[in-house]
């Protein structure tokens, strides 16, 4: 499994790719498992990635500083 983590500082959103790259339209459904934490799935139910909104309030600041920033 190839994992990738990105952080968009302007949007304060992080994304953990469990499949990379995710092609346009590949994510067919999502579930918000907790406020601001969303799981993306393909058409077969395979977990593609995790989106974290308001990431700076949820994730460790050090972790965000050590990620690829968009």
Where are these regions (language model features)?
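Short, acidic, Ser/Thr-enriched surface-loop or helix-capping motifs
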Residues: 9, 41-42
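A short acidic/small-residue loop/turn micro-motif
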Residues: 22, 54-57
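Short loop/turn motifs at secondary-structure junctions and domain boundaries
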Residues: 29-33
């Amino acid at each position: 499994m190839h994992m990738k983590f990105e952080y968009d500082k302007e949007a304060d959103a992080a994304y953990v790719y469990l499949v990379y790259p995710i092609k346009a339209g590949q994510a067919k459904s999502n579930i918000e498992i907790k406020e601001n934490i969303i799981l993306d799935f393909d058409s077969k139910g395979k977990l593609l990635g995790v989106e974290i909104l308001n990431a700076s309030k949820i994730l460790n600041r050090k972790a965000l500083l050590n990620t690829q920033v968009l």
